[in-house]
């Protein structure tokens, strides 16, 4: 997502705004503490993924090793030389930043084009609810990030179904919609029910 949106912002000369918002919000990464289960199994699972290339039979160690999540694989990508595992808790924060930037840009575009409709008010209400209810990164396990992405999925769904008339933009939104569905559903095993939204 970040690569796709990076190129989108780079083409529209909004890269400076993206970097400014990210820099301002990165302060939150130092303020918030980790999830309560982070030392229990988030850290050990992600560290095991980043340090070992062949993992089999680890489910006997603890409950956390039996519940896979794409968020843990994402955390293992944040393992960097010199920094080691100190950025593992950054994953949910980056998803929250991605949501805020996406919604703010969507609201700005709709306000400039004077296309204020149901989708605009749904995006505005979603922005308020997510930032009031989900602002505590300490509560973000594997489920909160998927719920944040689910709000974006519904926004894309309404735009595709009711408001998007341009065929090229519609195709881009459908691709983004499918990627977000599979990403949100892979964050927790029960969220595979989101795949029912695909047809």
Region locations from a protein language model:
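Transmembrane helix irregularities
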Residues: 1, 33, 81, 129, ...
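Membrane-embedded, hydrophobic transmembrane alpha-helices
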Residues: 1-11
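Transmembrane signal-anchor helices characteristic of membrane glycosylation enzymes that use polyprenol
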Residues: 14-37, 128-131
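Membrane-interfacial loop-to-transmembrane alpha-helix junctions, especially the N-terminal start
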Residues: 14-18, 112-123, 169-174
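Active-site lumenal/periplasmic loops and adjacent helix-entry segments of GT-C-fold
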Residues: 27-118, 137-139
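Multi-pass, polyprenyl lipid-linked donor-dependent membrane glycosyltransferases
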Residues: 91, 132-159
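Membrane-interface alpha helices of multi-pass inner-membrane proteins
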Residues: 134, 172-199
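Membrane-interface transmembrane helices that cradle and orient dolichyl/undecaprenyl
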Residues: 153-173
